[in-house]
Design a protein with these regions (language model features):
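Phosphate-group recognition and catalysis centered on beta-loop-alpha active-site segments
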Residues: 1-316
Length: 316
């Protein structure tokens, strides 16, 4: 129905026909059009170019994808961790600001049962305190410097609780909450489920874990919460796991066959952690649902603004 053509290719042909019409007839409207034919040609070309530019601009902004396609969603790994200290309030606010679809975070439980946002089981790398999370109480760590390891200007940044993060992110961004059980937890999964219910965020979050038993506990606490099983492999009979609504797969081990098999059973595919354009293009080409990256800006640019402006499109 549409074909690609150079700007103005078909328009002058109309006015060449008009020359013949002018010679054949002497009506007033033909005379006027003939007199202003150059202006009309120029204006027509401008209109066509303008419409085409608007079409391409909207397409590059993702506007034309809405309701038509399901473009790959972008998850900011531990928040916008390329620019801010990971798993902190500034990192999650940064992810929201740059338009990430999701933010990923890690949760653990302290000795007194507080659910905090922290990746490492040991606090030393980001706070300097050489203690395991499960060994300390919330009061012991709530005032620790959790930002200057990244940059001294973030020395006032503290470890956030999951509840604090939910308050910041509610209604602004989806969350992928990775549960990291220590073996000393009191009721980590149950507390996560309660918080999601309290803040009415069960439908805007997915709970993921390397421990399949954690997904079972989440589903038993609240079956409406979506879950994802984290794996570093993409082979084997994973696609029929009862308590997993999706799979989070390490990017270099992802296979197209696994993606196809999982999606045929209604499972979502999340891929981690993708920080290069080359790798991103490869995994997106496999038809995944969600990509996890430290740099959501780079990923958004490649996914939402693909390619260059095309040639002008004229109906034939």
């Amino acid at each position: 129905y549409y074909r690609k053509a150079a700007a103005g290719e078909r328009i002058p042909r109309v006015f060449r026909d008009l020359d013949n019409a002018y010679r054949i007839t002497n009506t007033r409207w033909v005379k006027k059009i003939y007199m202003y034919r150059k202006r009309i040609i120029a204006l027509s070309i401008v209109v066509v170019i303008g419409v085409n530019f608007a079409y391409n601009f909207a397409d590059r902004r993702g506007v034309l994808h809405m309701g038509l396609d399901n473009p790959v969603e972008v998850t900011a790994h531990r928040g916008y961790s390329a620019v801010y200290p990971e798993n902190t309030i500034p990192a999650f606010k940064g992810a929201i600001q740059v338009g990430a679809d999701w933010a990923e975070l890690d949760v653990q439980q302290t000795a007194d049962g507080e659910v905090i946002v922290m990746h490492d089981s040991n606090l030393k790398r980001t706070t300097g305190l050489d203690k395991e999370v499960w060994q300390v109480t919330w009061d012991e760590i709530k005032d620790l410097d959790n930002g200057s390891w990244f940059d001294k200007k973030y020395q006032t940044v503290r470890i956030p609780t999951l509840e604090e993060v939910l308050k910041v992110c509610r209604g602004k961004i989806h969350l992928n909450i990775e549960i990291k059980p220590s073996g000393h937890d009191k009721d980590l999964e149950e507390q996560v489920a309660k918080l999601l219910k309290k803040y009415h965020m069960r439908d805007t979050c997915v709970v993921s874990s390397l421990k399949y038993d954690s997904l079972r506990k989440i589903k038993q606490a609240d079956d409406s919460i979506e879950t994802a099983y984290i794996t570093s492999v993409s082979y084997g009979n994973f696609t029929d796991l009862e308590y997993a609504d999706g799979y989070s797969v390490e990017s270099t081990l992802l296979s197209k066959s696994f993606v196809n098999k999982a999606q045929k059973t209604g499972k979502q595919i999340y891929v981690w952690t993708v920080n290069s354009e080359e790798r991103l293009e490869k995994v997106v080409g496999m038809g995944i649902d969600n990509v996890i990256t430290d740099d959501p800006v780079m990923a958004k640019e490649l996914i939402v603004f693909p390619g260059f402006l095309g040639k002008i499109i004229i109906p034939t």
